[in-house]
Amino acid sequence: MKKTRSTTLRRAWPSSDFSDRASDRMRSRSEKDYRLHKRFPAAFAPQASRGYMTSGDVSPISMSPISQSQFIPLGEILCLAISAMNSARKPVTQEALMEHLTTCFPGVPTPSQEILRHTLNTLVRERKIYPTPDGYFIVTPQTYFITPSLIRTNSKWYHLDERIPDRSQCTSPQPGTITPSASGCVRERTLPRNHCDSCHCCREDVHSTHAPTLQRKSAKDCKDPYCPPSLCQVPPTEKSKSTVNFSYKTETLSKPKDSEKQSKKFGLKLFRLSFKKDKTKQLANFSAQFPPEEWPLRDEDTPATIPREVEMEIIRRINPDLTVENVMRHTALMKKLEEEKAQRSKAGSSAHHSGRSKKSRTHRKSHGKSRSHSKTRVSKGDPSDGSHLDIPGGREYDFCDPLSRVPREGCFLIEHKGDNFIMHSNTNVLESHFPMTPEWDVSGELAKRRTEMPFPEPSRGSSHSKVHRSHSHTQDRRSRNERSNKAKERSRSMDNSKGPLGASSLGTPEDLAEGCSQDDQTPSQSYVDDSTLRPAQTVGHQRAHIASTSYKEVCIPEIVSGSKEPSSACSLLEPGKPPESLPSYGELNSCPTKTATDDYFQCNTSSETVLTAPSPLGKNKEDHDTLTLAEGVKKLSPSDRQVPHSSREPVGHKEESPKGPGGGPAASGGVAEGIANGRLVQHHGAEPSSLDKRKEIFSKDTLFKPLHSTLSVNSYHKSSLSLLKSHPKTPADTLPGRCEKLEPSLGTSAAQATPASQRQQESGGNQETSFDYYNVSDDDESEEGANKNTEEEKNREDVGTMQWLLEREKERDLQRKFEKNLTLLAPKETDSSSNQRATHSARLDSMDSSSITVDSGFNSPRTRESLASNTSSIVESNRRQNPALSPAHGGAGPAFNFRASADPPTNEAEKLQKPSNCLQASVTSV
């Protein structure tokens, strides 16, 4: 038996190659093989294996029992036969298969019916073939049309082969080549039991598991549709028959019928169940209603009948922020925007035309920056981000503060009269905007801003500083220059209505016209070293609006430093709401709104640097100052300088409408003292500082508003502009560091830093002046100013910050002298305007010093103002020189403005004290 078993394991059969079998035997190393090799030499082993006649090898090995259908597993042969018959379009039945096997494999014993059925069932379970009423079909001929070589190397098939060949030999033992039938019978009796048992277990399990699979497979088979349960049942029946036969009756087939019946029932049941399940699944797939009932659109015929809640839910999903209230608010805001845009277009059409290209450039550049900032206070609207022309309306939406946002646009209507841009306070617009939530009221306003800002903010906020940036050769420089120019142009537009002071602060209509005319007439001038100035003037028209914003910003400094004072500044400014006092009114509006509006406007005006000026109060401005101390000094200082001039001037302007934008005489007086003090620190004389500041302011006014001292404005603008240009531009690059250094240096060398800072502030404030000078004198000496600025920038950049500050201070002293002369020459440059300018200078200085000289340790308003002036000058020059210092770069500027202009004291002493407050505020913010 051992031998027989070993032979069976080897599965040698008569037709097989004996040499191959011997090699197999050597590889398998069965007991028989081991004995064979042991007894006979290796050379003799092949012979013994071939003949199987060796005494030790052949006689006991009954080779006949190993009646494999073929060397290839029967299942594979059946697959090949079925595939061939399918290709020949012959129906494949068990009888046909038997015939085919007999014909195609004449040397191979034909399997019995039972083995054939069993093998076919196994193949069906294995999904290699599928039964149909027309016969068996190969499932995937490409996959299962396996060549004998593949089958040989397929252990799986060898395993099947082990089972199937044994079955075949059991059921139909072939007369072995040299095998006695007895051995075959013995093996038949013995092996079939085990084999059949294994087959039975296998088959039942496989059948149960695969019956549904078989059905599916057959259904899936492309050749035939779903096999009816009966069809499918037939192969299972065969399978179960064979399975049961072998499993229950291995030795004899006496009980095959019973077992077959059982297996039939079982198989039929399984197939039916599986088929039903499949059908149920299919039905389930298509039985569902579409669209599902839970879908909101229940009535397709009447879609208008969508439930309100469903519709709202859909809308919410589409746009969570979209609500009826928001939509209404957005619609109202858009209407207001359109109106404001129309007003702005009317007022600043020429300004828009002249500054459109520059504005677009600056808009793009500063829009990105301001957007990043405005993202923090998008709702507040980043006036600095948008051009101020756009900002007035944009700010209204951005800030939604009737006073802050709207006053700028609504309160100040820029009219281009002749060459002058006159800022008219549009009380109605202002009032119409007043109902709007203050910009600092973010809760309701934020949504509005979200809806509004997308449209107005870019044009407003971003246009404002963008215009500045685009105008300056570099975005930042442009931003600084444009801020200064915007503030100046605002002051100019205000000065048209108010006075040289207001004009210089906001930009007189002349300056606006000059900005337009110069921008339009002399692009090269506008692109002079401080091309931003030109653009600022071009933007000056925009700044006319911006000027109103600047006036608001002017008030903003006061409000920022002393949030209490916005009302005073506003009250001072409010009396003069006529176009002349519009700057005052703008300042007035900006004062009340400056708490928040000034945050935004001043930040925007100063440099968009205080893009984050979210706080409606001076604290935020102080924070902004702190945030953008260097930059704020750089950026805000120019704007703030302008703004302080404007804010301080508006009072004087109100008192003497031709004067400063929003300073008012009281503001002028306060500023005069503040400037005197600040400039005493700078110039060591309140009068020199105030006068210098007034010069600066007035020269600005004269620049913007030659009415007062047009004579010396141009000549002085040229000289002081050159100085200012050189100063602002020279420190532009060094300004950031210098402004930062300025605080320590201010602390260490207040006088030194003060002259330099004052120079810078004058450059910054006078940069506005010098920007205005550039605007006014750029026509005469745009190239000269540009060259001077470039040379001075280079020199000052090379020279130390303190040296540059000293140089700038000297130049500012000269400028202040010029401005004094201009102030004296200017008819509007009365004491009130001088006070306004001094106050403006003091505010600017105090704003700058409050931010920059926070650590200076100087509490005197003069020192603060001088430091602020220095800071402003540095900031302005840095802005001109270094675009990186542009408002977008620093947010400290607005803080300076806020503090400086937050003091709306009516008298110089009060304003000087307020610069101290500004300094303190800046210290707190810093």
UniProtKB/Swiss-Prot annotation:
GO biological process: embryo development ending in birth or egg hatching; maternal placenta development; regulation of transcription by RNA polymerase II
Composition bias, Basic residues: 353-378, 463-472
Bias (Polar residues): 518-529, 746-772, 847-884, 914-926
Residue stretches of biased makeup (Basic and acidic residues): 18-32, 379-394, 473-495, 632-658, 684-693, 785-799
One GO cellular component term noted in the UniProt record for this chain: cytoplasm
Single annotated GO MF: RNA polymerase II transcription regulatory region sequence-specific DNA binding
InterPro entries attached to this UniProt entry: Storkhead-box_winged-helix, STOX1/2
Region ranges (Disordered): 1-32, 338-394, 452-529, 632-693, 724-803, 825-926
Record's protein name: Storkhead-box protein 2
Species: Macaca fascicularis
